[in-house]
């Protein structure tokens, strides 16, 4: 293997590692944003007695990065199917009960998403370290084989 191909391979390993680390961080950020969204919905129901249409209009103005509102309210695919399904269940149930029921429902989903977030945040550091170490090891192997 010549030096040019080994450098190209090393750069590819670096880019793969960086891409994976960015995806892990996006997952954690999206989960945090979901908790923020659900908390905002709860506060708007509790203090402003907003209906579904008002909740959506207000949420659209809050500048979420991982939550979209058109054609329907969804969360980014970076969170995985299980979390995305839970988020869609929450969105579908907003406005289906009285105010107390909605507040209890919001509390339940806030706790669920805090659990998802805490799990993701606790694993994030170790995953990032492992992926970084593997990327460095692959880069070193590529350079040794090419040199």
What annotation goes with each model-predicted range?
Residues 96-138:
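Membrane-interface, cytosolic juxtamembrane amphipathic helix immediately N-terminal to a transmembrane helix
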Residues 71-100:
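Short, non-transmembrane cytosolic segments of multipass membrane proteins
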